[in-house]
Amino acid sequence: MKTPFSKMDGLGNQIIVADMRESTQALTPQAILALSADPEMHFDQIMAIRNPTKNEADFHIEIWNADGSKAKACGNGTRCVIAWLTDHNFGENFRLEAPTGIIEGKRQADNLISVDMGCPNFNAKEMPVSREIVDTNHIDITAGPLKDACLISIGNLHAIFFVENDVQHIPLEKYGPKLEHDPLFPERCNISIACITSKKSLNLRTWERGAGLTQACGSAACAGAVAAYRRSLTQRHIDVNLPGGKLNIFYREDDHIIMTGPIKYQFSGFLNPLTGCYKKDNS
């Protein structure tokens, strides 16, 4: 069984886009873990493109983390899907049926990819948390120097910790796993540290739920930008500098978050969704 795929790079976020429109076969845990363990195919997320189940959508996407768990959102992965669709002549503007609802995206004139990530959710009663939270702008959770987080859902849950010094000096590989698995988060959580560099920019590092330390996380960049604006630290339209590069985030007055940035192709080929075996297309 051959499934076309492209290995892509969304600012260092390693993404596999798999064209599963002609298949009813699900990706098996065996296949996902085999691909994740392969040095060349190792990924942060797999974005599986399927035919839509809703009339208002052009395509349906499933999202898988490297540990085999399902994800509800992946901003950089969605940008890679939009790029793949435009490069395969499906159009320029798309409505994608994602786990969190309909997501709109398009290719810009400058070849950057923009995605409307929808509206953030600050209501703790609608978040998978284990205790009552009165104010999601300031939650009582601590790990080492990290404290006083802002909790936001961008379809998936994010905790943003603001620090005064550069984000590279904090060992997120040490504190990230502890916070991801904190009892407050029964379904785990994405953990980011942010440092404000100006009213128009911030630096961000992320420990991603189910993927670990990543070069970039699009939904975390959105959460970081919104959290900074909520605390009156930045403007609505800012650059978020990640280890893998820069994303432009615009938190519009209608509450929608627009994320824009580049993507790169690495290689394409065919994979077996049952086993994870794959072959590059050298044509």
UniProtKB/Swiss-Prot annotation:
**Residues annotated for substrate binding in this entry:** N13, Q45, N65, G75, N76, N156, N190, E208, R209, G218, S219
Pfam families xref list: DAP_epimerase
Q: Indicate whether Ligase appears among the record's keywords.
A: no
- Chief localization class? cytoplasm
Question: Which stretches are annotated as coiled coil?
Answer: none
Q: What residues correspond to the site Could be important to modulate the pK values of the two catalytic cysteine residues?
A: H158, E208
Q: Name one GO cellular component term.
A: cytosol
Q: What is its EC number?
A: 5.1.1.7
InterPro entries in UniProt: DAP_epimerase_AS, DAP_epimerase_DapF
Q: Where are the transmembrane segments?
A: none
Compartmental location: Cytoplasm
GO terms, biological process: lysine biosynthetic process via diaminopimelate
Similarity comment: family membership: Belongs to the diaminopimelate epimerase family.
User: What HAMAP family does the database record attribute to this sequence?
Assistant: DAP_epimerase
Function (record text)? Catalyzes the stereoinversion of LL-2,6-diaminopimelate (L,L-DAP) to meso-diaminopimelate (meso-DAP), a precursor of L-lysine and an essential component of the bacterial peptidoglycan.
The record's subunit annotation is: Homodimer.
What protein name applies here? Answer: Diaminopimelate epimerase
Its ancestry begins with:
Bacteria, Pseudomonadati, Pseudomonadota, Alphaproteobacteria, Hyphomicrobiales
